[in-house]
Amino acid sequence: MSDGDYDYLIKFLALGDSGVGKTSVLYQYTDGKFNSKFITTVGIDFREKRVVYRANGPDGTVGRGQRIHLQLWDTAGQERFRSLTTAFFRDAMGFLLLFDLTNEQSFLNVRNWISQLQMHAYCENPDIVLCGNKSDLEDQRAVKEEEARELAEKYGIPYFETSAANGTNISQAIEMLLDLIMKRMERCVDKSWIPEGVVRSNGHTSTDQLSEEKEKGLCGC
Amino acid sequence: MADTIFSSGNDQWVCPNDRQLALRAKLQTGWSVHTYQTEKQRRTQCLSPGEVEVILQVIQRAERLDILEQQRIGRLVERLETMQKNVMGNGVSQCLLCGEMLGFLGSSSVFCKDCRKKVCTKCGIEASPGQKRPLWLCKICSEQREVWKRSGAWFYKGLPKYILPLKTPGRADDPHFRPLPVEPTEPQPQSAEVSRVYTWARGRVVSSDSDSDSDLSSSSLEDRPMPSGIKGTKYDKPRGDSGGSMESPRMGPARPPSHLSGSQSSLGSETGAGATDPQGGTLPRPEPRVSGKRHTWATTHY
């Protein structure tokens, strides 16, 4: 694991209230295990995982696998670590925003966390995946799925109901975030290479302008 | 321990950025002064020495990963520089990369979208094979885009800090010094030999490391199954020509814009003065100038 033999280093950061299961979700994803004992995270931590990403091309063909080294930052949700953890927001390429399905206050604080992201992340619209954790505790559920999905649609972010205890939807959530990041990377690289003012006066002028407008609108960086 | 992390590796004092200041404030290091806080507030907000120790250990682990990443990016940059150094044609009547004659009596050519030079179909890569209008890139510009993606430069708005491979320290200097003066006749055979040996050695590295993946991707796009052998043969022919033809392609081909501004990739591990990233700002697009590019490129290495 500690070698430089990969194609991309991608950094994600998990955030949310204290006790919602950020550390457990990342531990389940990297090691496939769950520890029911609650040990509060001190400030900041990170885990690593090597995955293979296969992009789906526009024509439906599956591209060649690319080796991704994931650095998964785990933050402390407590208020007294806030200024420490927000300092790490800028280096993260994507964010995993967690709340506890059995704790309505953690769901209400999702708005505050998104505001924190808009202030401290690398841009105002970073890629976020919302996760309602502890979906296995159905009898203690306090947040309806419709409510959470409605909030996610309002912010335009994907929503998954996860469980660190049994591993439900954890891989899907992180793979969705990785897909969003890789697509954003392709848009950024393609956009930055379009030379401005070099549109030649030929039969394809209108096509070039249309494609440029589309690409400009898509890229949020 | 904290002072060691924040002040190590750099004798010259550099003003710390906002994130370092925020981190120092919370860790009670640096020049942070809590003038207006009462003792009670200070005690509740301060981290205990044990907590500070845990956080610093995490930061050290992150720095070890960053070093590996910097070395990996250095290998990508070295590979790209080698490709740029080994161009053999003028990109107009000859293929930019292999120097093969193009046009009426020569091979068919394609036009690179980025550097706007001509290359033969073997030295070009179709960037969007599924669409109606084929979009071609020469292999150098395609490799440039790969470096931009794999190094994280798309995210940091510039090429992050990297460490060049140590096994070839002399060659790292070559691209910056040799193009500037006019080389005398005698050293040319030596440089040609060195280039040949290095190209052959690079072929070995390609077959064993992650570079082979991109080569496999390239070969799948090409029609002929044995491109490397044919290219090797063609590489030898132009070297036998006069020195003038070797000089002109180095001046002629313009490199695609590569932004080499430093960027903070790890909090607390770098003390270099990086430019503040504008939130939501557009990507920088400087005017392409050959001398400016090389100067910027050279600055980053030292």
From Swiss-Prot, chain A:
UniProt xrefs under SUPFAM superfamilies: P-loop containing nucleoside triphosphate hydrolases
Disulfide bridges in this chain: C123-C188
Membrane topology: Lipid-anchor
One Pfam match: Ras
Catalytic activity entry: GTP + H2O = GDP + phosphate + H(+)
One biological process term in Gene Ontology: vesicle-mediated transport
Keyword Transmembrane: no
Regulation: Regulated by guanine nucleotide exchange factors (GEFs) which promote the exchange of bound GDP for free GTP, GTPase activating proteins (GAPs) which increase the GTP hydrolysis activity, and GDP dissociation inhibitors which inhibit the dissociation of the nucleotide from the GTPase. Activated by GEFs such as DENND10.
GO molecular function: G protein activity; GDP binding; GTP binding; GTPase activity; myosin V binding; protein domain specific binding
Subcellular location(s) of the protein: Membrane; Melanosome; Late endosome; Lysosome
Endpoints of the signal sequence: none
Modification Cysteine methyl ester, positions: C221
Outcome of mutating N133H: Increased rates of GTP binding and GDP dissociation
Key words of the record: Acetylation, Disulfide bond, Endosome, Exocytosis, GTP-binding, Hydrolase, Lipoprotein, Lysosome, Membrane, Methylation, Nucleotide-binding, Phosphoprotein, Prenylation
Outcome, altering G19V: No binding of GTP and GDP
Residues bearing a lipid moiety (S-geranylgeranyl cysteine): C219, C221
Residue positions where N-acetylserine is found in the record: S2
EC number: 3.6.5.2
Residues reported to bind GTP: 16-24, 74-78, 133-136, 163-165
GO annotation, cellular component aspect: apical plasma membrane; dendrite; exocytic vesicle; Golgi apparatus; late endosome; lysosome; melanosome; multivesicular body membrane
Annotated positions of the Phosphoserine modification: S2
Biological function: Small GTPase which cycles between active GTP-bound and inactive GDP-bound states. In its active state, binds to a variety of effector proteins to regulate homeostasis of late endocytic pathway, including endosomal positioning, maturation and secretion. Plays a role in cytotoxic granule exocytosis in lymphocytes. Required for both granule maturation and granule docking and priming at the immunologic synapse.
Subunit structure comment from the entry: Binds SYTL1, SLAC2B, MYRIP, SYTL3, SYTL4 and SYTL5. Interacts with RPH3A and RPH3A. Binds MLPH and SYTL2. Interacts with UNC13D. Does not interact with the BLOC-3 complex (heterodimer of HPS1 and HPS4). Interacts (GDP-bound form preferentially) with DENND10.
Protein name: Ras-related protein Rab-27A
Swiss-Prot record, chain B:
Assembly and binders: Recruited to dense-core vesicles through specific interaction with RAB27A in endocrine cells. Interacts with RAB3A, RAB3B, RAB3C and RAB3D. Interacts with ZYX.
InterPro entries from the UniProt entry: FYVE_2, Noc2_FYVE, Rab_BD, Rabphilin/DOC2/Noc2, Znf_FYVE-rel, Znf_FYVE_PHD, Znf_RING/FYVE/PHD
Function: Rab GTPase effector involved in the late steps of regulated exocytosis, both in endocrine and exocrine cells. Regulates the exocytosis of dense-core vesicles in neuroendocrine cells through interaction with RAB27A. Acts as a potential RAB3B effector protein in epithelial cells.
Gene designation per UniProt: Rph3al
Protein name per Swiss-Prot or TrEMBL: Rab effector Noc2
List of residues binding Zn(2+) 1: C95, C98, C120, C123
GO molecular function, one term: zinc ion binding
Phosphoserine carried by residues: S248
GO CC terms in record: presynapse; secretory granule; synapse; transport vesicle membrane
Domain observations: The N-terminus of the RabBD domain is necessary and sufficient for interaction with RAB27A.
Disulfide bonds: none
Subcellular location: Cytoplasm; Cytoplasmic vesicle, Secretory vesicle membrane
Swiss-Prot/TrEMBL keywords: Cytoplasm, Cytoplasmic vesicle, Exocytosis, Membrane, Metal-binding, Phosphoprotein, Zinc, Zinc-finger
Biased composition (Low complexity): 258-269
Organism from which the protein derives: Rattus norvegicus
CDD domains given in the database record: FYVE_RPH3L (cd15763)
Tissue note: Highly expressed in pancreatic islets and parotid. High to moderate expression in adrenal gland, pituitary gland and ovary.
Source species taxonomy: Eukaryota, Metazoa, Chordata, Craniata, Vertebrata
Ranges annotated as FYVE-type zinc finger: 89-146
Major subcellular site: cytoplasm
Region (Disordered): 174-194, 206-302
Chain positions recorded as Zn(2+) 2 binding sites: C112, C115, C138, C141
Alphabetical GO biological process terms: calcium-dependent activation of synaptic vesicle fusion; G protein-coupled receptor signaling pathway; glucose homeostasis; intracellular protein transport; negative regulation of G protein-coupled receptor signaling pathway; positive regulation of calcium ion-dependent exocytosis; positive regulation of insulin secretion; positive regulation of protein secretion
Superkingdom: Eukaryota
Entry annotated with the keyword Transmembrane: no
Domain spans labelled RabBD: 41-158
